């Protein structure tokens, strides 16, 4: 998830809902190094044991990774997190606190984050507590492998991405996965129109680029002959 929001009660309310994710949380920041991610020698344990003892890194087991100040994520860390996301298991929530649109995630990492949520314009009074029932989530996860996405639905998502000038092939695949998840959450057996609309809003909308404006035809020079007089 790419979560664009300043630190505050609105963002906290959404993050609290992630307690229903059955994965341990791991907090990351832009200065997180390779030893923290992949593990390394535990000096204290090595000295105490008299032999080399290695400590496991954050990526050793599937986890819910929370990357704070994601707009400052350096290219190296972005590449390592992207590699981790390419394998099944980890979930990443990138907390983008950028003040302007120019302050944003590295493109390679943003491409791997399927869902985009922007809370900058959301006031506390417009929110309500998000309560995710653990049993319902477990049932939805159990249904998910059997959820079907018809060919015409996948074609509609691909066509929508093309019309929005989205060149990434990940986008329609991520949108299809989001639509299947939405169908599982509402207890359906196949993807429906409402699931496609939700997937398009969360996965495709922020990636689209407006079509170039048509340029007006140049005006003829003042000394051009008047064709009406010929």
What are the functions of these language-model segments?
Residues 1-120:
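Conserved ASCE/P-loop NTPase catalytic core
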Residues 4, 8, 27, 146-151, ...:
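Conserved phosphate/pyrophosphate-binding and hydrolysis machinery centered on Walker-type P-loop NTPases
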Residues 11, 34, 134-137, 154, ...:
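Alpha-helix initiation and N-capping motif
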Residues 90-164:
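Phosphate-sensing "switch" segment of ASCE/P-loop ATPases
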Residues 156, 173-178, 194-198:
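Amphipathic alpha-helical interaction segments
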Residues 162-169, 177-191, 202-209:
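AAA+ ATPase "lid" subdomain C-terminal helix
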Residues 188-230:
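C-terminal engagement/docking regions of AAA+ P-loop ATPases
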């Amino acid at each position: 998830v790419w979560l664009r929001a300043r630190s505050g009660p609105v963002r906290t309310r959404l993050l609290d809902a992630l307690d229903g994710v059955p994965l341990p949380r791991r907090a990351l920041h832009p200065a997180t190094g390779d030893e923290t991610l992949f593990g390394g020698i535990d000096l204290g344990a090595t000295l105490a044991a008299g032999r080399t003892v290695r400590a496991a890194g954050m990526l050793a087991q599937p986890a819910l990774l929370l990357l704070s100040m994601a707009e400052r994520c350096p290219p190296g860390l972005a590449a390592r997190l992207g590699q981790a996301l390419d394998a099944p298991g980890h979930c990443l929530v990138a907390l983008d606190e950028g003040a302007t649109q120019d302050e944003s995630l590295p493109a390679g990492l943003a491409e791997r984050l399927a869902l985009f949520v922007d809370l900058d314009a959301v006031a506390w009074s417009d929110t309500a507590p998000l309560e995710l029932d653990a049993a319902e989530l477990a049932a939805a996860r159990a249904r998910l492998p059997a959820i079907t996405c018809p060919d015409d639905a996948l074609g509609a998502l691909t066509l929508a991405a093309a019309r929005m000038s989205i060149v990434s092939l990940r986008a329609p695949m991520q949108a299809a996965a989001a639509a299947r998840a939405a169908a599982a959450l509402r207890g359906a057996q196949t993807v429906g129109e409402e699931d496609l609309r939700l997937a398009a809003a969360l996965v495709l909308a922020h990636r689209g680029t407006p079509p170039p404006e048509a340029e007006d035809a140049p005006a003829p020079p003042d000394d051009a002959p008047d064709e009406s007089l010929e």
